UniProtKB/Swiss-Prot annotation:
This is Small ribosomal subunit protein uS3. One of its GO terms (cellular component) is cytosolic small ribosomal subunit. GO terms for molecular function: mRNA binding; rRNA binding; structural constituent of ribosome. Belongs to the universal ribosomal protein uS3 family. Binds the lower part of the 30S subunit head. Binds mRNA in the 70S ribosome, positioning it for translation. It comes from Deinococcus radiodurans (strain ATCC 13939 / DSM 20539 / JCM 16871 / CCUG 27074 / LMG 4051 / NBRC 15346 / NCIMB 9279 / VKM B-1422 / R1). The keyword Metal-binding does not apply.
């Protein structure tokens, strides 16, 4: 089940939170859900160069709070705050009622953010990079940035082949069935001349214990000299003596 289900949905309420946090009745629920989807589409289209990793929407009464997690917050804010003011006006035209507040959060380490890694691979494939090279370089970059494991899945007409297939790159370990595992999940689409390729990235950052993500170092293997007891070399083994078997009368 861990290989099929969305890793974020599988861990909701355990180690992951909701991207939309509000409550509405039966009559308003559908319209507010549609507004959230329109807001996300607008932000992803308007701020594609900012490296958007996550968009959270909170509603309380007539107040709508949009939190944008981006690798380049300067692109979201713009010169003198012009871009964020324009974005706030566009969102207010989509929202049925209430005032809109837009906040920007910077991602401290974009190299271990799964959505950003997937977007980077998609950009390289669209610029005609070799897909295997792009996948391996992305996985190595994630591991060098301190992640415990990474899994990259690429599917579609790879290399312009007639038949679609799937290729995977795995570095470290990615425990999909462990609910306390802090796994970041992201997807992206690479639009090429021979079709659309789907990219999935899963990054394992450690295990969440007591509300904190803890990483455990792998035990290092000791050398042979360190494993020997103090006081000399290893005692020689006695070879078993061969017994001569004689037949009885």
């Amino acid at each position: 089940m861990g290989n099929k289900i969305n890793p974020n949905g599988f861990r909701l309420g355990v180690t992951k939170g909701w991207n939309s946090r509000w409550y509405a009745g039966k009559k308003q629920y559908a319209s507010l859900l549609k507004e959230d989807e329109q807001i996300r589409q607008l932000i992803n289209k308007k701020l594609a160069a900012a490296g958007i990793a996550r968009i959270e929407i909170e509603r309380a009464g007539q107040q709508v709070n949009v939190i944008i997690s981006a690798a380049k917050p300067g692109v979201v804010i713009g010169k003198g705050g012009e871009s964020i003011k324009e974005l706030r006006g566009d969102i207010e035209r989509l929202v049925s009622a209430g005032t809109v507040a837009v906040n920007v959060a910077e991602i401290p380490n974009p190299n271990i953010s799964a959505p950003l890694v997937a977007l980077r691979i998609a950009e390289q494939i669209e610029r005609r990079f070799a897909f295997r090279r792009a996948m391996k370089q992305a996985a190595q970059r994630v591991m060098e940035s301190g992640a415990r494991g990474v899994k990259v899945i690429l599917s579609g007409r790879l290399g312009g082949a007639e038949q679609a297939r799937t290729e995977k790159v795995l570095e470290g370990r990615v425990p999909l069935h462990t609910l306390r595992a802090d796994i970041d999940y992201g997807t992206a689409l690479a639009r090429t001349t021979y079709g659309i390729l789907g990219i999935k990235v899963l990054v394992f950052n450690g295990e969440v214990i007591g509300g904190k993500t803890e990483t455990f170092a792998r035990p290092q293997r000791r050398d042979r000299d360190e494993r020997r007891p103090e006081g000399g070399d290893r005692p020689a083994r006695r070879r078993p003596t061969a017994r001569r078997r004689t037949g009885g009368e």
